[in-house]
Amino acid sequence: MSAKDFLVELGTEELPPKALNSLGEAFLSGIEKGLKAAGLSYAAARFYAAPRRLAVLVEQLAVQQPDRTVNLDGPPLQAAFDASGNPTQAALGFAKKCGVDLQQIDKSGPKLRFSQTIAGQPAAGLLPGIVEASLNELPIPKRMRWAARREEFVRPTQWLVMLFGDDVVECEILAQKAGRESRGHRFHNPDNVRISSPAAYLEDLRGAHVLADFAERRELIAKRVAELAAEQQGSAIVPPSLLDEVTALVEWPVPLVCSFEERFLEVPQEALITTMQDNQKYFCLLDANGKLLPRFITVANVESKAPENIVSGNEKVVRPRLTDAEFFFKQDKKQPLESFNERLRNVVFQAQLGTVFEKAQRVSGLAAYIAERIGGNAQNAARAGILSKCDLATEMVGEFPEMQGIAGYYYATHGGEAEDVALALNEQYMPRGAGAELPSTLTGAAVAVADKLDTLVGIFGIGMLPTGSKDPYALRRAALGVLRILIEKQLDLDLVAAVNAAVEQYGDKVKAAGLAEQVLDFVFDRLRARYEDEGVDVAVYQSVRALKPSSPLDFDQRVQAVQAFRQLPEAEALAAANKRVSNILAKSEDEVPPNVDASLLVEAAEKALGSAVANAESEVAPLAAARDYRAALARLAALREPVDTFFADVMVNVDDAAVRANRYALLAKLRGSFLGVADISLLG
């Protein structure tokens, strides 16, 4: 079947930059979905997106649908004909429904069947509907109307190109009649641009100063920004989201280096970077030491004969922004950081849980408690907790919310606070996301864990649990943050005790009954998802969870040991044996003695197992106490042979009550040795 290239381009007013790439992807997805539903084959398809256009190019699209056969089944043969072979009303009705004589109906199968071959339709007649359906399904939160038209789209439409091979596909979509006339760059080539063929689309527009390919523009900008930064003896900060947004703002990108006064470098560089990135869409430059350079890169959408004018204009625009940041910084430094705490007495943390000031007091107490138990400085942790929320009341954070914690660090340093105290004011918010940086100090870790536990206990304590996708207080992230800090920083903290301490600090603000258990279950349940992401089988997690270790670090050490144990050849048999032992002991109506009586060991197999368990117990106990769980399980793996022999040769439930109880005691000792690490019966 013959095929042609297909191109559709919808021209618009400037599209929302943050949504441009996703709109292009959705446009392509919708068209591919429509083509597949129509049975139209093609070789490849891709989208193009620029500020004023969305386009899709489909290569080697079939010019016509294939013919298809439709089978329509009717009544069973026994219902279609009577005993004399005459057609019944059911048969006649089926033939009438199909619009044919009964003679044309297939009677060879168990049911009447009518088969009809439907000729495939030309693709050109189907394409307008496919394109329109895709446009209607674009993820546009709010559509708009323009002029006096009834059509709605994300922005007013300006033109429509639709070519199938060399021919225009005649149609009208979103108030635009299809043609082959596109538009060039708004300033360089404002006139119409004739698209000679779908394959020539990119080059035809390139000649009109338009790079329609989003990926090409993105790569060009990234490359040129890196080159310009290197020329300035620096490196550019290029967040992917900013690069995408800038790419979506320009059709003909021209990066240019601009500068600002060095006096602004006295302001925390994070504030300068925030305002230049978020408000002006500039790429900031850092020196080899990671310090901000007094230069930045803007990406113009025009190739000017006088680029110095564009540079000058951007420098004038950014100056007031930097001046504001400078003003806020100087104003805040006029008073001690701790003085801002008074303002927090009137700032509500949560209506039922009190003010941010009260939260800081609780965080201070809990941070000191935690620091003392992880080897940190309790006094410094308490001080950091007191100061932890002060910067929320500053002018700087009021203008730049992203500066919370960072501003606190600078103001604490300016005020002569200890370095770890100052760092903790920023580190309390770590990790800020999945895989993000963790606190570098014990003081920072203590405050970060305390802050998160305080939030978890408080919100759970008033019954505002996260449900489904709704988690307004980011409790899942808080729980994962606590776990990451304690596990990855190798900090051994009894989380049960810490959560109970957090509950006590709230007093009667929360419903304390069962609260600690609820919070702990929530936190440790987050470990399940963490391990699943790491490829750890859920059974391994459950084998450790059954013991309810109170320290996340201890929990992780056990999980890693069980994961290693599962790779041993003895693991499967011992897991099954432990499950069998668990069932035997659960069904026992006799009281199990605490110790094994060697004089009651009658069979050779039980004597061998008794000796093996006793020896293993003496060796495993110190290993488990030292948390060398991997070595402990490796030692217990040697019990496989005596365990297998015991179950093969020994009847546990004998009539002699004393012997039976002694065998229960032996099995309990065996199981207890493994339970010092995990319940491996759950691995089966």
Curated annotation (Swiss-Prot):
The EC number(s) this enzyme carries: 6.1.1.14
InterPro entries named among the record's database cross-references: DALR_anticod-bd, Gly-tRNA-synth_bsu, Gly-tRNA-synth_heterodimer
Keyword vocabulary terms for this entry: Aminoacyl-tRNA synthetase, ATP-binding, Cytoplasm, Ligase, Nucleotide-binding, Protein biosynthesis
Entry's Gene Ontology BP terms: arginyl-tRNA aminoacylation; glycyl-tRNA aminoacylation
Entry-linked PROSITE patterns: AA_TRNA_LIGASE_II_GLYAB
Subcellular location: Cytoplasm
Family of this protein: Belongs to the class-II aminoacyl-tRNA synthetase family.
Protein name as annotated: Glycine--tRNA ligase beta subunit
Organism: Pseudomonas aeruginosa (strain UCBPP-PA14)
Lineage start: Bacteria, Pseudomonadati, Pseudomonadota, Gammaproteobacteria, Pseudomonadales
Gene behind this protein: glyS
